[in-house]
Regions:
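Short, small-residue-biased leader/transition segments that mark boundaries at the very start
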Residues: 2-6
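Short Pro-Gly-centered flexible turn/kink motifs
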Residues: 52-71, 488-496
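Conserved, mostly hydrophobic/aromatic
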Residues: 57, 103, 133, 171, ...
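Active-site neighborhood of glycoside hydrolase catalytic domains
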Residues: 161-163, 195-197, 201-358, 370, ...
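Catalytic cores of secreted or luminal carbohydrate-active enzymes
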Residues: 360-409
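Carbohydrate-binding surface patches
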Residues: 412-455
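C-terminal beta-sandwich/jelly-roll accessory domains of carbohydrate-active enzymes
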Residues: 439-499
């Protein structure tokens, strides 16, 4: 080719500028170069359907953006974002506190559960070292499927064989914490709430509303809607002594029409919706200051720094396939700290893709995040139960390293037949490197990967073969696996400072 080399920055070289919007609504990010060869960048509220009316003396606060620069590539840029979000965006009781390893019942039962099933899942999980049981969708109202019940935040005591406080007490007596799923911003047309307050839902008069997951969106711009939700959520959390809440949002916002807003202010509704969500979250967390809140939006649909101000971890994707998660978590790492990445070991064949992945690999991928399980542990083999114990122990051993350490992407997405990443302690005393083989080929060559971030003049022992080398040698020579990894197999390698 005769064209000039592309001025592309890499992980460890080149100038990089990042912009991260602290906002959870409609947004635009655009870059353009003018006739004087100057680049102009914009980021903020999307102008489509946005018009905010200000009276004399009123002010409007625009969303903030976090800007960062690195002269040494994308890795440094990401590490700077990880630090600022972890230290200056995330807050609350779990900003730095160790978060419990959880098991969620969703992929184990979906809507088909009762108290007995949930307690059996909890009992087995507790035996294997898991610290919290999270009860997902289906515990409230007449919610036997996704066609009804949203908005009726009252415990279905017939289904649960008693109150939520009774179930929570049984879980707590096992020595486990207990969490609940909510989807506060949504409403089912087949619900007592909708029958009582149809005007609380976004819907354009005279039109059939757009449904997604068989539900509508509540008008979060309304104070009466937020007051109802705040009373229901705080009552349940306080009565049952709930330790954790998963705050879900399983559809996008459309049909934006409020029955109480003036017609000339319809252009404010999308933005006021976001402000209403923030207001509810702020008051909810003020009423429940010891709560761990995990955000979710069909997975990562609202995975942003605005939500991280309220939830220090967000369910990264409803796709729990370990191989798909490699690219999902890779992309998330460019801006967001690994401590914010909700990641679980799920059942195989995977419920989203049908793929069969080794249990060990599923654990290694989930360790690059908050870590938990999404399955019925009573239905796995004894060998897999031993792996659960090992994975739980590994999470405790490496928790500070994965949640507070420096993160390195060692591979891209398409350049090789494996993916690798590394965590390095801030004092450079240890590092954890993980490799996952993504493609098998005939006559496979040994995997060779970079090693990054070790102190140049310190000696490090590699757990793979106990070889000791200077950090500068590992950093330059990298690591070669002499054992052959099969497709979807993984390995963890630790480097420990020799003192």
């Amino acid at each position: 080719s005769l064209h000039d080399a592309l001025p592309i920055s890499g992980e460890t070289h080149g100038s990089c500028i990042g912009a991260c919007l602290v906002y959870s609504g409609n947004f635009v990010a655009a870059a353009q170069k003018d006739q004087k060869n100057q680049t102009r960048f914009q980021m903020g509220i999307h102008p489509t359907n946005f018009c905010f009316h200000l009276e004399k003396g009123e002010a409007f606060d625009t969303p903030q953006a976090i800007l960062s620069y690195s002269g040494t590539g994308l890795t440094k840029l990401s590490q700077q974002y990880h630090e600022i979000i972890r230290e200056h965006i995330c807050r609350g009781a779990y900003k730095h506190a160790k978060r419990p390893i959880l098991i969620n019942n969703w992929e184990a039962t979906y809507f088909d559960f009762n108290e007995e099933k949930i307690l059996k899942i909890a009992e087995q999980a507790q035996k294997l070292g898991i610290e919290m049981l999270v009860l997902d969708d289906g515990w409230f109202g007449k919610r036997e499927d996704d066609n009804s019940g949203l908005g009726d935040w009252f415990v279905n005591e017939k289904k649960m064989n008693g109150s939520m406080a009774q179930l929570a007490e049984k879980i707590h007596r096992m020595g486990m914490k207990f969490g609940l799923w909510f989807e506060p911003e949504m409403i089912s047309e087949d619900s007592d709430l909708y029958r009582a307050h149809p005007d609380w839902a976004f819907a354009i008069p005279g039109r059939v509303p757009n449904h997604s997951r068989n539900q509508l969106v509540l008008d979060m711009t309304r104070e009466d809607v937020r007051e109802y939700l705040l009373e229901r959520l705080t009552t349940i959390v306080h009565d049952a002594k709930i330790d954790y809440v998963k705050w879900d949002m399983n559809r996008s916002v459309c049909d934006v029409y409020s029955h109480v807003a003036a017609q000339n202010r319809n252009g404010e509704l999308y933005h006021r919706y976001v402000l209403g969500v923030y207001d509810l979250l702020e008051r909810f967390l003020a009423a429940c200051p010891d709560l761990l809140l995990e955000g979710c939006s069909g997975g990562g649909g609202r995975y942003d720094a605005g939500m991280m101000y309220y939830s220090p971890q967000i369910w990264c994707s409803d796709n729990t396939d370990a191989i798909n998660r490699l690219s999902i978590q890779y992309g998330s790492s460019f801006f967001y700290p690994i401590s914010t990445v909700g990641s679980h070991v799920s059942v195989c064949p995977n419920h989203q893709t049908g793929r069969v992945t080794p249990f060990r690999t599923r654990g290694d991928v989930a360790l690059a995040g908050s870590f938990g399980y999404e399955m019925d542990l009573n239905k796995i083999s004894e060998e897999e139960k031993e792996m659960v114990k090992e994975q739980v122990a590994a999470m405790h051993e490496y928790y500070e390293l994965t949640h507070e350490g420096l993160y390195y992407r060692l591979t891209g997405l398409k350049k090789q037949d494996f993916m690798a990443w590394e965590f390095v302690a801030k004092d450079q005393s240890r590092a954890l490197l993980t490799i996952v083989k993504t493609d098998a080929e005939g006559n496979m060559l040994p995997v060779h990967t970079k090693v990054c971030g070790l102190a140049e003049d310190k000696l490090y022992r590699c757990s793979l073969d106990q070889e000791v080398r200077l950090g500068r040698t590992w950093n330059r020579a990298g690591l070669t696996l002499h054992q052959v990894l099969g497709e979807y197999e993984s390995i963890r390698v630790e480097f420990t400072e020799v003192k």
